[in-house]
Design a protein with these regions (language model features):
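Short alpha-helical elements
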Residues: 1-110
Length: 110
């Protein structure tokens, strides 16, 4: 994962909370987990096919995906990327608005 993208992602990731009863395993590197999750989401492979080369177990990757989804990480990251690209003048909002206007809504939707 490029350092520039990680600089946007890292502050948005919820901080690891140690178990109150102690024990458990050492926390896994957030960057490795994020990279593994993005791989699963973009490659078309299933969670069970996550290559071990990422250094993240399937249960850990899936658990963090679920936790981060509940914490709205993906929505906040999307907004952060749009803000960054917008500040550079690299977003064509006229096209985004046109695309949004051409999406058909369901009957009864507001």
């Amino acid at each position: 994962m490029p350092d520039e993208l990680w600089a946007l992602v890292e502050p948005l990731i919820p901080k690891f909370k140690a178990r109150p009863q102690g024990g458990g395993t050492a926390p896994v590197d957030d960057r490795a987990v994020f990279t593994a999750i993005v791989y699963v989401l973009t490659s078309g492979c299933g969670w069970r096919e996550l290559p071990p080369s990422f250094g993240v177990t399937v249960p850990t990757a899936h658990r963090r995906f679920t936790e981060w989804t509940k914490a709205a990480l993906w929505r906040r990251l999307h907004q952060a990327v749009l803000d960054e690209l917008g500040s550079r003048g690299e977003v064509d909002w006229s096209r985004a608005i046109l695309d949004a206007a051409s999406v058909r809504s369901k009957k009864g939707a507001t």
